[in-house]
């Protein structure tokens, strides 16, 4: 009889062998629908469409996605538990490793409890459902620049929803005054970091307004986890905010280098999610992702110097862009975006950089505007020389 570990090892080896043999075919199939296909994991140097590039895209802020210890932890989880539980968490689908993710997240965020979800995209609907069930709000007020995972789900609760001008606390106050009915409490929903331009939301102002009306704030903090705050706990820590009226969720796929969503908080808020539709109606997360998440959080806590390096790289990138003539803020967010006179100009610069072996993003993502933008991201693992090369090539083209 073939042992469980032996079977999993053989199956994994076979899949890897098949994947390598079929890489060209798969790339061709995907290439018919997507312009770019990554042939290696995100790192300062990455292979795209079969060519090696200096890579300034995505959200792998610490390149944990290719860190040997993270990969080893993912492999062990896969060998121990198989690919997934093939059922929901509240049936038989809770592996011990999922509980360990939640325990580690509580430690990382300094929270009483946490719930691990299969995807970061689910954090907002899960959070909204919990807060609504607990009676924390009766009407939602959403920053119009919020991520799609907020705007896609904000009407699902069948509660009144109002949008306010992007990053504008005064408009938020006006909308609440005009629309909140007597006895109602507002929920203000926003990103912590808006992903395209890397701007940090004015959360202290949002919070003051929400508190004035006995309301609360919910943040999609996917881009801030690991990046902002002394301990990498995100936007609230960055601003020094603490209150039982502040709630958030995030992803483990960016700074942490794994996959899945995480909502830290007190047990009152976590319990309705643990027993709710998002958890009951979905398969549990991939075991390898859980193993990677635990190791990613451990590395984040053990190596705060990585965050300091990330901030240094962010300062170098933004200072260089300012010298070229592009307006940039002074935040430690390692994301910078800028526009040129026309979409055609941005297409040209993007193409020329690709020809010179440098990959940045030509983005039309949330908040990019009708012509889109050019966007560059630095990792903690980029060298000063690599960042200088990007800046030098960009300056020559604009």
What are the residue ranges of the model-derived segments?
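Conserved N-terminal alpha-helix of the aminotransferase class I/II PLP-enzyme fold
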Residues: 79-119, 314
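N-terminal export signals
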Residues: 6-25
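C-terminal segment of N-terminal export signals and the immediately downstream linker at the start
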Residues: 1, 21-47
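Active-site C-terminal subdomain of aminotransferase-like
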Residues: 201, 213-216, 223, 228-332, ...
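Conserved PLP-anchoring active-site segment centered on the Schiff-base-forming lysine
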Residues: 130-148
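Active-site phosphate-binding strand-loop segment of PLP-dependent enzymes
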Residues: 162, 166-219
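PLP-dependent enzyme catalytic core of the Aspartate aminotransferase-like
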Residues: 68, 72, 76, 80, ...
């Amino acid at each position: 009889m073939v042992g469980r570990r032996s079977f999993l090892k053989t199956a994994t080896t076979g899949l890897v062998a098949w994947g390598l043999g079929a890489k060209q075919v798969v790339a061709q199939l995907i290439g018919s629908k997507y312009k770019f296909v990554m042939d290696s994991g995100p790192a300062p140097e990455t292979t795209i469409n079969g060519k090696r590039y200096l890579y300034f895209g995505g959200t792998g802020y610490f390149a944990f996605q290719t860190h040997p210890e993270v990969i080893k932890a993912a492999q062990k989880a896969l060998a121990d538990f198989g690919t997934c539980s093939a059922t929901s968490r509240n049936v038989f689908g809770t592996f011990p490793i999922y509980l360990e993710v939640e325990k580690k997240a509580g430690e990382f965020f300094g929270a009483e409890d946490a719930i691990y979800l299969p995807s970061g995209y689910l954090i907002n609907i899960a959070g909204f459902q919990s807060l609504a069930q607990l009676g924390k709000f009766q009407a939602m007020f959403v920053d119009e620049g919020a991520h799609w995972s907020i705007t896609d789900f904000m009407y699902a609760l069948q509660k009144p929803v109002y949008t306010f001008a992007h990053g504008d606390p005064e408009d938020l106050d006006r909308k609440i005054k005009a629309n909140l009915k007597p006895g109602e409490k507002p929920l203000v929903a926003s990103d912590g970091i808006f992903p395209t331009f890397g701007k940090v939301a004015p959360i202290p102002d949002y919070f003051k307004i929400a508190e004035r009306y006995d309301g609360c704030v919910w943040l999609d903090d996917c881009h801030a986890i690991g990046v902002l705050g002394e301990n990498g706990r995100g936007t609230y820590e960055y601003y020094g905010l603490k209150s039982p009226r502040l709630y958030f969720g995030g992803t483990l796929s960016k700074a942490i280098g794994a996959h899945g969503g995480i909502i830290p908080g007190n047990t009152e808020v976590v319990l309705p999610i643990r027993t709710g539709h998002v958890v009951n109606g979905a398969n549990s997360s991939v075991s390898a992702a859980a193993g990677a998440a635990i190791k990613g959080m451990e590395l984040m806590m053990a190596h705060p110097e990585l965050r300091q390096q990330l901030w240094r790289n962010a300062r170098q990138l933004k200072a260089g862009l300012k010298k070229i003539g592009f307006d940039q803020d002074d935040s430690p967010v390692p994301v910078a975006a800028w526009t040129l006179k026309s979409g055609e100009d941005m297409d040209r610069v993007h193409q020329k950089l690709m020809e010179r072996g440098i990959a940045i993003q030509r983005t039309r993502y949330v908040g990019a505007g009708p012509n889109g933008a050019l966007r560059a991201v630095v990792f903690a693992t980029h060298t000063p020389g690599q960042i200088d090369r990007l800046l030098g090539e960009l300056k020559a083209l604009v």
